[in-house]
């Protein structure tokens, strides 16, 4: 087994590297669980893609994805509790953004979508 160089690199041809370097395998498992292994994962993936392209409030997300507002709120709560999205405030019109951790690991998210057959 090869040992990394201490700079976040590893011996698996870069498969564990995100935008910002090393990808924590626990975070990757969390993404797999939330996107590929649970009911509602497709909608969570769609929300993450939308918020990555342009942060928005829950109402705007519901309109753009053509989903019920309460469904969006549920998925945003799941994503928020798991550290994937964050809001600028707790207001009704709060804008949702990807967390720095999710931004750093966005490539892993895309990889999961490709393997899951959704990209």
Question: Which stretches of residues belong to each language-model region?
Answer:
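Short amphipathic alpha-helical interaction segments
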Residues: 67-78
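Glycine-centered, phosphate/nucleic-acid-interacting loop/turn motifs that mediate DNA/RNA or nucleotide
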Residues: 83
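Short alpha-helical segments that sit at the start of domains
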Residues: 17-45
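Conserved segment of winged-helix/HTH DNA-binding domains
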Residues: 30-31, 95-119
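Short capping segments at the starts of secondary-structure elements
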Residues: 42, 53-57
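Hydrophobic residues on short alpha-helical segments
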Residues: 45-51
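A short acidic, leucine-rich amphipathic alpha-helix
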Residues: 60-64
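Short, Lys/Arg-rich nucleic-acid/phosphate-binding segment
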Residues: 89-95
């Amino acid at each position: 087994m090869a040992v990394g160089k201490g700079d976040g690199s590893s011996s698996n041809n870069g498969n564990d590297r995100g935008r910002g370097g090393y990808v924590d395998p626990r975070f990757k498992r969390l993404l797999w669980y939330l996107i590929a292994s649970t009911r509602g994962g497709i909608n969570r993936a769609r929300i993450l893609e939308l918020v990555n392209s342009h942060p928005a409030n829950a109402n705007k997300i519901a309109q753009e994805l053509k989903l019920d507002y309460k469904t969006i709120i549920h998925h945003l709560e799941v994503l928020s509790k798991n550290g994937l999205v964050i809001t600028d405030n707790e207001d009704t019109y709060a804008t949702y953004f990807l967390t720095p951790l999710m931004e750093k690991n966005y490539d892993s998210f895309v990889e999961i979508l490709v393997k899951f057959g959704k990209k």
